């Protein structure tokens, strides 16, 4: 006997007493997609980023600071 799952407010799951497991109702099977557990690699996603003028300015300042620190370390090694 199938009874609606009282813990699920959307009615997607029901409790199957025969197997004593939660199952997905037939009304929502088309919305459900299983994850293939035997797959080790998935498709790659394109990654995009946005760099503002402030980002560029801050990166330039950091780069210049690195150069100053590197050059002062080289001078102190002499």
UniProtKB/Swiss-Prot annotation:
Keywords on record: Cytoplasm, Developmental protein, Hydrolase, Metal-binding, Metalloprotease, Nucleus, Phytochrome signaling pathway, Protease, Signalosome
Intracellular or extracellular location(s): Cytoplasm; Nucleus
GO BP annotations, alphabetical order: proteolysis; red, far-red light phototransduction
Disulfide partners: none
Signal peptide annotation: none
Keyword Transit peptide: no
Cofactors, names only: a divalent metal cation
E.C. code: 3.4.-.-
Subunit structure: Component of the CSN complex, probably composed of CSN1, CSN2, CSN3, CSN4, CSN5 (CSN5A or CSN5B), CSN6 (CSN6A or CSN6B), CSN7 and CSN8.
Functional summary from the UniProt entry: Probable protease subunit of the COP9 signalosome complex (CSN), a complex involved in various cellular and developmental processes such as photomorphogenesis and auxin and jasmonate responses. The CSN complex is an essential regulator of the ubiquitin (Ubl) conjugation pathway by mediating the deneddylation of the cullin subunits of the SCF-type E3 ligase complexes, leading to decrease the Ubl ligase activity of SCF. In the complex, it probably acts as the catalytic center that mediates the cleavage of Nedd8 from cullins.
Protein name per its UniProtKB record: COP9 signalosome complex subunit 5b
Species of provenance: Brassica oleracea
Gene that this sequence comes from: CSN5B
């Amino acid at each position: 006997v199938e009874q609606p799952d009282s813990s699920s407010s959307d009615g997607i799951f029901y409790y199957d007493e025969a197997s004593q497991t939660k199952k997905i109702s037939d009304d929502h099977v088309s919305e459900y997609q299983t994850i293939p557990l035997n797959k080790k690699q998935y498709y790659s996603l394109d990654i995009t980023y946005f760099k503002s003028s402030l980002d560029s300015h801050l990166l330039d300042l950091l780069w210049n600071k690195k150069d100053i620190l590197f050059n002062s370390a080289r001078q102190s090694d002499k």
